[in-house]
Amino acid sequence: MTGNELEIELKEPLLPVEEYLAAGVHIGTQQKSKDMMKFIYRVRGDGLYILDIQATDERIKTAAKFLSQYEPSKILVVTSRQYGQYPAKKFADAIGGMAVVGRFIPGMLTNQRLHGLNKYIEPDVVVVTDPIGDSQTIAEAVQVGIPIVALCDTNNMTKYVDVVIPTNNKGRKALSVIYYLLTKELLRLRGVATSLTPEDFETEL
């Protein structure tokens, strides 16, 4: 493979830009954090901050490569967001990981007394859907030294996040697309073919 061919491969998006836009992956909030400034493309007339799709695409690849270092069964995905629950569970099922959707019980990562109740889990890496909604998970992961991958919107703080995926982390279609691409890329890196589509990750209204 020549240098030019390698460059083309690295820059080839996981999804056409039009499909990212159609899913609203780039639509942020009307707030921005200092941490997320480098991922913001522009601000719209209505005050909404717009994320850089190229950065999103690159960070999905980075996150997948990072996660590929871990045993699938030791990857935990967490989401308290309603629209994140179905795609997060689908992600976990597809890669052979663990999922906690809905309420995260305090102590799940730190209190071994919950082990007898089948509530204590010991992942090697955690994926969270929203650093705000999943703040308890992040606090516990930091406490026990577990690396964190997070889907971060324009208003999120990323202080304790090891790998940031800049994205709309509230929209139904956006979350389904992100988890689909993360699944597909992670499986590809492991040499596993998949027939999954973005629609397979999309929860019903």
From Swiss-Prot:
Keywords: Ribonucleoprotein, Ribosomal protein. GO terms for molecular function: structural constituent of ribosome. InterPro entries: Ribosomal_uS2 (IPR001865), Ribosomal_uS2_arc (IPR023454), Ribosomal_uS2_CS (IPR018130), Ribosomal_uS2_euk/arc (IPR005707), Ribosomal_uS2_flav_dom_sf (IPR023591). SUPFAM superfamilies: Ribosomal protein S2. It comes from the Archaea. GO terms for cellular component: small ribosomal subunit. PROSITE patterns: RIBOSOMAL_S2_1 (PS00962), RIBOSOMAL_S2_2 (PS00963). GO terms for biological process: translation. The keyword Disulfide bond does not apply. Coiled coil: none annotated. The keyword Ribosomal protein applies. It holds the Pfam family Ribosomal_S2. Belongs to the universal ribosomal protein uS2 family. HAMAP family: Ribosomal_uS2_A (MF_00291_A). This is Small ribosomal subunit protein uS2. The gene is rps2.
